[in-house]
Amino acid sequence: MDILIFVTAAAHLVYTPFTKVEESFNLQAMHDILYLRNNFTQYDHHDYPGVVPRTFIGPLVVSIISAPFVLLFETLSINKFWAQYVVRLVLAGAISVAWNSLRQAVTKIYGVEVRLWFTAITITQFHFMFYMTRPLPNIFALPIVLFAIAYWLRDQHKPFIICSGISILVFRSELALFLGILLVVSLLRRKVSIDGLLKVALPAGVCILAATVLVDSFFWRRLLWPEGEVLWYNTVLNKSSNWGTSPFLWYFYSALPRAMGASLVLVPIGVALEPRIRPLVLSALLFVLLYSILPHKELRFIIYVFPVLNIAAACACQRIWMNSAKSTWHSFLALACGAHLLLNVFITLFLLVISGTNYPGGAALSRLHRLEAGTSNVSVHISNLAAQSGVSRFMEINNEWTYSKDETMNYTQADLVAYTHLLVEAKNKQNTELWASLQNEFDTLEFIDCFNSIGIQYNSLLPVRIKTKPCIGILKKRPVAPKEASKTKEKIAKTKTYPVEKETLLAPVKEFPKVIGDPKMKSRLQVDADDDDGIVSTVEEMSLELETDTEPHAGAETIETPLKEINFQELRTLALGQATKKSRAATKMKIRQIIEQHYRAKGKQIENDSAETQKTQGKAGLRQSVKSIIKQEKIKEMIEQIATMDLTRICDLERTSTKDCLKQVIDKIDDSEGLKSK
């Protein structure tokens, strides 16, 4: 039965594979460690740091264990969404090992029968099994706490103190209450002395604190003790209440009944019948009582006490079952103990079905991947609700797609130009006008439902019904005729003033797939400076449409656009395919600006020559203007070529700036394509 706990947790994971915003830091951290590796500047936490910093130690350990599986997936070209299963199963495996250690301690103290009941009760409850695969700070602390409790039951106080220190200083500072109470009990029972405590606690505490400060300061780029900042924010400043408050006794009348299910009624019976369990259970309940002082409450905050209470319930079941032959009443009670497990299973199935409707964002992006399978150059914007309810970097499985979680999105016409698809909150009273405007340009492919409420149905075998409502809409931009597109661009140009660093006179760049290890990519990174064929990549010919809005504005040649400096590392990261979607777009925008600026500098002479030619040659001058427009269209191809080059093979970057090197490359490509005006 030992493997059952892991298998049950895995079943919960398969049914609910997505995650919520509370899990995002650890999940994104594991993704970045596994896929971005030493490209630390592109890690997700730099763009989305969260309210308080969290430790990287948990994600780092899980990622190290998961790395061989992820490398195998990459070798077999298995998309990285399956790697999310791997890291979460590794976390569940760690908890299973720790839980098994606790189970062995229970066997040694209370007997084999209690162990069997303990296992049966645990796997039939919902919340403990469900949270085993959730990458939350509390869950990273859970296996260490289970080891600590097991050591405490065995009176092995040195490893108990070390495990307590790790869980408190690295993961969850509030565990000082629970594990501190257990330590006080040991001191009062004289199972450990103060001298012995200090000899272990002081050096262990210093080493543990130094480890978390060293590791996390490196990843966060500042001197940092993450759990110290969390403690200050939640406890001293009491700002955790910004995320909601609950009544003082909420843990007792809401969290514990839901987590324990029918087993809760057996806990006091177990405490009454088994004196040896009382110190542990009372310590756990005292921890819950003290922790109730903080107004912000969540069930996962007290998940560490569930196994302790289950031991008490198992003791009750064992005593009742052992006496089942004494009388009819005892037989009935024994039958009730077995039946309560079946009731737990029904509660678990009901809660699991509800839980499956709580991740509309993940379901929406997964559905979009199926709907648009085989479609390239997709740019999808992920709304805030979608990002908080299931979307993670593990779901960015298509290298030809652009995934954006831009929080400044206002859904204006200018904002929507960049996107082909939207995951947007479904229509409600607050966003009626938004949906009215979106339906002018986008078609609704599907709606993804999420949990709404629980209803009662009297004319059905199942009296309880789970009600859902549309939460996320999947939208796709309608194809636009060239003339309409031209009018739209003119309208946008009149109504919106672009920031200087985003200003452009050209159509948006099409995204091309970037695959690390692609032979074509490698050949591009190894070109020589005098090899025109190497510099000029073979790209698919783009259709060239002469649009009325491609002509520069009057006086444009006199304006020198200020640029954010582009550096070699940005280009190198882009060429190797290691850049994030956000940084890749920013780097390409800088390349585009340099090309436009360089062309404007050359374009003055071209325009003057063209004007003189038109006076003398008429139609020949007109053909020259057409060539100039075609040249502007070719810039889109040029950006893609530059994005795959290794500039160290072309320029001496110790003597030449990156910007000047890019200008040399532009001229080289320009010459090879025959685009220069003659």
Swiss-Prot record:
- Location within or outside the cell: Endoplasmic reticulum membrane
> What GO molecular function terms would the record report?
alpha-1,6-mannosyltransferase activity; dolichyl-P-Man:Man(7)GlcNAc(2)-PP-dolichol alpha-1,6-mannosyltransferase
Transmembrane intervals = 1-21, 56-76, 81-101, 109-129, 133-153, 168-188, 200-220, 252-272, 279-299, 301-321, 334-354
Q: Which reaction does it catalyse?
A: an alpha-D-Man-(1->2)-alpha-D-Man-(1->2)-alpha-D-Man-(1->3)-[alpha-D-Man-(1->2)-alpha-D-Man-(1->3)-alpha-D-Man-(1->6)]-beta-D-Man-(1->4)-beta-D-GlcNAc-(1->4)-alpha-D-GlcNAc-diphospho-di-trans,poly-cis-dolichol + a di-trans,poly-cis-dolichyl beta-D-mannosyl phosphate = an alpha-D-Man-(1->2)-alpha-D-Man-(1->2)-alpha-D-Man-(1->3)-[alpha-D-Man-(1->2)-alpha-D-Man-(1->3)-[alpha-D-Man-(1->6)]-alpha-D-Man-(1->6)]-beta-D-Man-(1->4)-beta-D-GlcNAc-(1->4)-alpha-D-GlcNAc-diphospho-di-trans,poly-cis-dolichol + a di-trans,poly-cis-dolichyl phosphate + H(+)
Task: Determine the domain of life of the protein's source.
Answer: Eukaryota
Q: Does the keyword Transmembrane helix apply?
A: yes
Q: Where does the protein principally reside?
A: endoplasmic reticulum
* EC code(s) of this entry: 2.4.1.260
Q: Which PANTHER family match?
A: DOL-P-MAN:MAN(7)GLCNAC(2)-PP-DOL ALPHA-1,6-MANNOSYLTRANSFERASE, GLYCOSYLTRANSFERASE
Q: Could you say which protein family the record assigns here? A: Belongs to the glycosyltransferase 22 family.
Query: What's this protein's function?
Result: Mannosyltransferase that operates in the biosynthetic pathway of dolichol-linked oligosaccharides, the glycan precursors employed in protein asparagine (N)-glycosylation. The assembly of dolichol-linked oligosaccharides begins on the cytosolic side of the endoplasmic reticulum membrane and finishes in its lumen. The sequential addition of sugars to dolichol pyrophosphate produces dolichol-linked oligosaccharides containing fourteen sugars, including two GlcNAcs, nine mannoses and three glucoses.
- Write down what this protein is called: Dol-P-Man:Man(7)GlcNAc(2)-PP-Dol alpha-1,6-mannosyltransferase
